[in-house]
Every structure is written in structure tokens, then in C-alpha cells.
Amino acid sequence: MEHSAELRAALDAAEQAAAIARTLYQRNVEVRIKADKTPVTEADVRCEIAIREILEARFPAYGFCGEETGSRDAQAESLWLVDPIDGTKAFVREYPMFSTQIALMRRGEIVLGVSSAPAYGELSFAERGCGAYLNGKRLAVSEIAALDAAALSSGNIKSLAAGKQWTRYGALVARVNRIRGYGDFLHYHLLAGGKIDAVIESDVNILDIAACVAIVTEAGGRFTDLSGAPVTLQTTSVLATNGRLHAQVLAALA
């Protein structure tokens, strides 16, 4: 399987970040609280610096938007989107539900993504028109088409719980076959691999999810916000499904 130069760069950057994360994981790293009240560690910063150096060296004309080191040329036609440690709280509490997320957005559309979870042992990637893969195996979403047969996973849903859709979400939960809360990278990997059928989140930012947009869609799924709108830099919620269930879930939440 031949990769584009951009995907090779993203994979190399993810590998470098994984090496750094492994050296610092379960090492009692110092934690600082940022202005937005989220934690940051040495691992977050070092991983992003390493990723940024690789991507900017190979593609100096591309823009960059990172969780820790900020943005450069954010209006560029091609824009890297990077969360070096998505799941910093998991990293700090020493359980393996953290990952590195690297995506490339071109003219407003996500064209490739790499989702690397070194402590969990999963590496997933996708590029437009080339399919999605997990640990070298081609991914495909499920063919489940009925809610009463579907497995639904929810992640960050705090604002959903405080809004008018909460009652509708509860009714949806009662209709599906199985409800879980895998969260973070894992439920997107599972969705792309046909292990679950839908994912709902109401509190995300684009850096959390951009790579998984590419992975889910290249596996045959559909990825929008909770209103059904396409993913943009401003997206804060997620409905991701195998595609067959998308309209039904949107209708249930409307």
C-alpha cells in the first residue's frame, strides 16, 4: 500500500510522538492547569513540538493548528490539525485511553487522519479515496440498519445533559440494542471497524476529532455534528454512524 507524502509525514510524526509518550507515561509527570481549566503535561508539549517539526519541515507552506503550540497560517489552503495527547487526564491518571491525533484539512475538508494510541496498542489511519486501516487491517463499518439492533457509544455529553435534547437522547438510549461509553479515540476505532454502530458527543473541538472524521468516513461511515451539519473548524458536537443509521438518529434527537 503506497501512501502520499502527507500521510507518510503524519505517520512519522505520530511514531515520534508515541516514542516520547512512552518514555513519560506512568512517570508521575508534572501537571499544569491551563486557562481553559484543562490539564497539560510535559508529554503534551514535547509531543506537539516533535510533530510540528516534522510536518513543518516537510510541508513549510501548510498551515498548522495545535492544541499546545498554537496556530500558524490557519487560513492556509492546507492545514494540519494536531492534538498531541488527546486524553491528557487519562495520561495523568495512568490508564491507556490517550492518543495522538493528526489530520490534514484541505480547502475546509479533512483529507487524511492518523489516530495513534501507543499505550493501548492501536494505530489507525485513513486517506481520502484510499480506505481506513487499524494495525494494518482494512476497516469497514457495520451493516446494521435498525436502531433496535444498534450499539451506541457516548463520550463527552455534559452540555447535552443540560439541554433540550437530553430527554430525546434518553428515549434514543431506550430504543437501541446496547449502550456503552467507550469514549475518546476508542469508539471511533470501533465504529470504523464495525464493532459498534453510532457515536454521540456534545463537547468536543476539531482537534479531538479531525483524524477520526477521516477514519470513519473512509471506512464507509458518516460523520456530522448533532444537527447533521458537516464538520468544520468550529464543530463542537458529533454524530458519527455507519451511515445506515444516521438519519434515524438525527430524527430521534430532533
Placement of each model-derived feature along the sequence:
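N-terminal subdomain of lithium-sensitive/metallo-dependent phosphomonoesterases centered on the IMPase/IPPase/PAP
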Residues: 1-85, 244-245, 251
